[in-house]
From Swiss-Prot:
One of its GO terms (cellular component) is plasma membrane. It is found in: Cell membrane. The keyword Transmembrane applies. The chain crosses the membrane at residues 4-24, 27-47, 61-81. Keywords: Cell membrane, Membrane, Transmembrane, Transmembrane helix. It is a multi-pass membrane protein. This is Uncharacterized protein PA0522. It comes from Pseudomonas aeruginosa (strain ATCC 15692 / DSM 22644 / CIP 104116 / JCM 14847 / LMG 12228 / 1C / PRS 101 / PAO1).
Amino acid sequence: MRTLTLCWLALLALAVTGVLLGGAGDSPWLLAAVLACAVAKGWLIGERFMELAHAPALWRRLLLAWPLLMALAVGAALYLARMNN
């Protein structure tokens, strides 16, 4: 139970950090930090709350690949939108 509490606190800290960074300005580095927070939250949820830490390596890699791909897609879309303005 202690591990889940620590994970919950980490998720809370990552969520607050993402919100604060998202409202701090409009810089590519801030965007990267917000997306990194989102990927870290996805990893924590998969590894601890969904208990995939003991799952086969393929499932763990696929679960981490999804938030990474989504973060890359969002980052690329925002980069392209910035280039067009």
